[in-house]
Swiss-Prot record:
Main location: cytoplasm
Lineage: Bacteria, Bacillati, Bacillota, Bacilli, Bacillales
The EC number(s) this enzyme carries: 5.4.3.8
Enzyme class of the recorded protein, top EC level: isomerase
Keyword Ribosomal protein set for record: no
SUPFAM superfamilies: PLP-dependent transferases
GO biological process, alphabetically ordered: protoporphyrinogen IX biosynthetic process
Protein name, as recorded: Glutamate-1-semialdehyde 2,1-aminomutase 1
Molecular function terms, GO-annotated: glutamate-1-semialdehyde 2,1-aminomutase activity; pyridoxal phosphate binding; transaminase activity
Homology family: Belongs to the class-III pyridoxal-phosphate-dependent aminotransferase family. HemL subfamily.
Keywords: Cytoplasm, Isomerase, Porphyrin biosynthesis, Pyridoxal phosphate
Native organism: Bacillus licheniformis (strain ATCC 14580 / DSM 13 / JCM 2505 / CCUG 7422 / NBRC 12200 / NCIMB 9375 / NCTC 10341 / NRRL NRS-1264 / Gibson 46)
Pathway: Porphyrin-containing compound metabolism; protoporphyrin-IX biosynthesis; 5-aminolevulinate from L-glutamyl-tRNA(Glu): step 2/2
PANTHER family to which the protein is assigned, alphabetical: GLUTAMATE-1-SEMIALDEHYDE 2,1-AMINOMUTASE, GLUTAMATE-1-SEMIALDEHYDE 2,1-AMINOMUTASE 2
Superkingdom, natural source: Bacteria
């Protein structure tokens, strides 16, 4: 494939946009560098770049595009919003409709509030939890990304009983001192953290199914134990379902797993491709939020008609019969094919899959926590990523990210993808 126009565009972008990209995950730094491919058009499961090359897309904008690009029902909803005004600054009937849809889908939401992103949603759940409990510290799990607000850009300390350290320049040490980071799926470390800091903990922030160092499921009983221990300490459980909500079933991962949090943060899929976030939870906790309570949160763009109508349309599509069965079927087909080709060519991989999302790790070890994900072979992934890109398969440019199947993908797309996997593994083996 030729990428001449992408390369020229990236050179121009570097003159005007920091790093040439508007989110660092879009750069190719994690896969050895180079000019990221610039896309011009998306339709269904496919992308076309500025050089005219066609790709089968498994990035899905890092998850939100679960119905494929430019789904006609969602497109029509956005067009309707554009024709009637995209921003009012007033209440609308559509935001009530959408709030009811979310509550019906996720029973833990007694009350909801719309915001503009997953970052905002998580940031506000932490504020609300602090207001409700009168405490300040939070616990999070290593490797789990919860947006780019200061409080969650914190790396682990030297152990579960030590405070975190800033994971980004510009995050004050004083803020990192409010965060304890422990390994995911390690209940003993979680107990140790609570033994040390329990009386100061406002909430634990949990991805019930991890999506940010690949797809990693909780061990049996882990979430239940986290709930029990947290509540015994007088703290709240916050689920970050920005990636997981409506990804694995119609509703949240909490409903799939049968574990209920106190507060939930939502984003990505619920906007149908437009910017949105939402948070919600138990009535008595949510009543801490202004104008009812002292925890302030506001937003000019929050609940705007364009995002709300797009979100309603997206959920209407996802509610159709057979949606999640199809995603699971195609996911299984893709997983089985990848593993078979890896065995044929003698490539060490493991695949973590849940229904229509999976991660391919270049390792022979089952990945259950961030340390294991970190130890997978990044050089092998980088080579694989570039080989797949040349064969018309668009993946996220990071070994930590998931492949997302959409409702627009077909069995033929999976077969074509597996041909590319077979050829790429063959090339990798020859280089070893």
């Amino acid at each position: 494939m030729q990428h001449t126009q992408s390369e020229k565009l990236h050179e121009e972008a570097l003159q005007h946009i920091v790093g040439g990209v508007n989110s660092p995950s879009r750069s190719y730094k994690a896969v050895g560098g180079g000019s990221p491919v610039a896309m011009e058009r998306g339709s269904g499961a496919y992308f076309w770049d500025v050089d005219g090359n066609k790709y089968i897309d498994y990035l899905a904008a890092y998850g939100p595009i679960i119905t494929g690009h430019a789904h006609p029902h969602i497109t029509k909803a956005i067009q309707t919003a554009a024709e009637n005004g995209v921003l009012y600054g007033t209440p609308t009937k559509h935001e009530v409709t959408f709030a009811k849809m979310l509550k019906e889908a996720i029973p833990a939401l007694d009350k909801v509030r719309f915001v503009n992103s997953g970052t905002e949603a998580v940031m506000t759940t932490i504020r609300v939890a602090r207001a409700y409990t009168g405490r300040t510290k939070i616990i999070k799990f290593a490797g789990c990304y919860h947006g780019h607000s200061d409080l969650v850009l914190v790396a682990a300390g030297s152990g579960p009983s030590t405070l975190g350290t800033p994971d980004s320049a510009g995050v004050p040490k004083s803020i990192a001192n409010e965060v304890i980071t422990v390994p995911f799926n390690d209940i003993d470390s979680y107990k140790e953290a609570l033994d040390k800091w329990g009386n100061d903990i406002a909430a634990v922030l949990v991805e019930p199914i991890v999506g940010n160092f690949g797809i990693v499921e909780p061990k049996s009983g882990f979430l239940e134990q986290v709930n029990e221990l947290t509540h015994n300490a007088g703290a709240l459980v916050i689920y970050d379902e920005v990636i997981t909500a409506f990804r694995f079933m119609y509703g949240g991962a909490q409903d799939l797993l049968g574990v209920k949090p106190d507060l939930t943060a939502l984003g990505k899929i619920i906007g149908g491709g437009l910017p949105i976030g939402a948070y919600g939870g138990r009535k008595e906790i949510m009543e801490q939020v202004a104008p009812l309570g002292p925890a302030y949160q506001a937003g000019t763009m929050a609940g705007n008609p364009a995002s709300i109508l797009s979100g309603i349309a997206c959920l209407e599509v996802l509610k159709e019969k057979g949606t999640y069965e199809k995603l699971d079927r195609l996911g299984a087909m893709l997983e089985e094919g990848i593993l078979a080709h890896a065995e044929t060519h003698g490539i060490d991989i493991t695949v973590n899959r849940l229904k229509g999302a999976l991660t391919v790790y270049f390792t022979n070890e089952k990945v259950e926590n961030y340390e294991q994900a970190e130890n997978t072979d990044g050089d092998m992934f980088a080579a694989f990523f570039k080989l797949m890109l040349e064969r018309g398969i668009n993946l996220a440019p990071s070994k930590y990210e998931a492949w997302f199947i959409t409702t627009a993908h077909t069995e033929e797309d999976i077969k074509d993808t597996l041909k590319a996997v077979d050829d790429s593994f063959k090339q990798l083996k020859q280089r070893m």
